[in-house]
Amino acid sequence: MSLVPASLPARRSAARIDFAGSPRPTLGVEWEFALVDSQTRDLSNEATAVIAEIGENPRVHKELLRNTVEIVSGICECTAEAMQDLRDTLGPARQIVRDRGMELFCAGTHPFARWSAQKLTDAPRYAELIKRTQWWGRQMLIWGVHVHVGIRSAHKVMPIMTSLLNYYPHLLALSASSPWWGGEDTGYASNRAMMFQQLPTAGLPFHFQRWAEFEGFVYDQKKTGIIDHMDEIRWD
């Protein structure tokens, strides 16, 4: 059953999303790190100072919370190239962090830190996120690794997504690293997944058969004021 009625060509035209296809398979990686105090192991809201010391670097980004530094790769041809790209940035960044009495921490959540003690990064997009998501948004004390894959044609996107969703439980089991929350054992191997899905535009993607269905979904989300931009959809 199609989610985009074929009888609405005008709506289809308005919903169209330009697809930036990749002439060959590529990948890029975004890796979120928490900053933790070397002595207490609690989170440290020092990302602004760390990024300032690193200087202008397109491979280092701020994130929603000021306890987080994101390291990103460029567009790479293979996994080995992406890993080396990340290492080249991570080495100097780690040294700066250690010189400031902190360590880089990588897990889905922090085992005991309190979300209410964390500071938000001052940026319009993050302010809008909190405005829309309120209490749940302020609790997003989570980190992850995002892999972007270049695909030649929009027609290939949904079949690939469907195939990946069939293996979602396996991928989650392999990457789960967040059983603790606020000092308590949650009983879940990935409490990060449980927290993230509370946001209305996060969690698992819907099942679309065609790219046009996804375009229609994004159009409706914008039309109803749920999102302003497509990148506000943050599916796992």
Q: What do these predicted ranges mean?
A:
Residues C76-T79, G150, A154:
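Short strand->helix junction
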Residues V147:
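An acidic/histidine-cluster motif and surrounding catalytic segment
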Residues D122, R152-D236:
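Loop-rich catalytic cores of soluble enzymes, especially ATP-dependent carboxylate-amine ligases
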Residues M1, M83, M102, M140, ...:
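Detector for methionine-enriched segments
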Residues S2-W143, W235:
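Terminal catalytic/cofactor-binding subdomain
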